[in-house]
């Protein structure tokens, strides 16, 4: 994809210049409700209007790409954590402004995860993965902007491993239910 090509180029440029870059992963809140309630045609119009709004909010050198459905990624060259957080907050705010489409007003929200190169990742693929992890952390709060941290990545991996182990234990009937009454000592 174009984003992957540009991300690859930006990583090489950052290496050559001893610089940095940020990748922002945006996921829309409440878009499914619009699609389900108003139809995919209106949903597509909302995405087009939002894409135009975000396009106007871009700064020189930035690249915005729709990843599918209601997800977007923004590549911000020569950006550290402060710049990336400011861009993330600005985009979440721009998305939250009501959109007029087909004579109706639609309110969306967004959650934003951010990964930084080279501090969070060794290459573009890892940068995308870490931005995705940070976005899911932000989505837990809705409307939040979160930087990737190794602790969040480790915590997510532990939760996924635990969920897999629980599914396996259920499938193999290794879990048993025990009734354990709880009483207060004061009673």
Question: What residue spans do the PLM features occupy?
Answer:
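Sensory input modules used in signal transduction
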Residues: 25, 76, 114-116, 179
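PAS and PAS-like sensory/regulatory domains
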Residues: 8, 104-110, 175
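PAS-family sensory domain
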Residues: 19-21, 62, 143, 172-175
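Conserved long alpha-helical elements within nucleotide-processing catalytic cores of c-di-GMP signaling
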Residues: 1-22, 29-59, 65-77, 81-89, ...
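Active-site core of bacterial EAL-family cyclic-dinucleotide phosphodiesterase domains
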Residues: 158-187
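Residue-level signal for alpha-helix termini/capping positions
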Residues: 12-15, 100, 171
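Hydrophobic pocket-lining residues within nucleotide cofactor-binding pockets
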Residues: 28, 79, 117, 152, ...
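Cyclic nucleotide signaling catalytic output domains
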Residues: 64, 90, 94, 100, ...
């Amino acid at each position: 994809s174009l984003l992957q090509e540009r991300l690859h180029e930006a990583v090489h440029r950052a290496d050559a210049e001893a610089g940095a870059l940020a990748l922002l992963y945006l996921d829309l809140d409440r878009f499914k409700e619009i699609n389900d309630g108003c139809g995919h045609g209106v949903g597509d119009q909302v995405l087009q209007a939002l894409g135009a709004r975000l396009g106007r909010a871009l700064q020189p050198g930035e690249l915005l790409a729709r990843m599918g459905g209601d997800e977007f990624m923004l590549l911000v060259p020569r950006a550290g954590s402060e710049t990336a957080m400011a861009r993330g907050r600005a985009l979440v705010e721009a998305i939250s402004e009501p959109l007029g489409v087909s004579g109706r007003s639609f309110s969306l929200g967004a959650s934003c995860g951010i990964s930084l190169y080279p501090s969070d990742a060794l290459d573009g693929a890892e940068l995308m993965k870490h931005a995705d992890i940070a976005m899911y952390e932000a989505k837990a709060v809705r409307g939040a902007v979160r930087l990737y941290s190794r602790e969040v990545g480790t915590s997510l991996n532990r939760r996924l491993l635990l969920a897999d182990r629980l599914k396996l234990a259920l499938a193999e009937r290794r879990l048993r239910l025990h009734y354990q009454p709880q009483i207060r000592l004061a009673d």
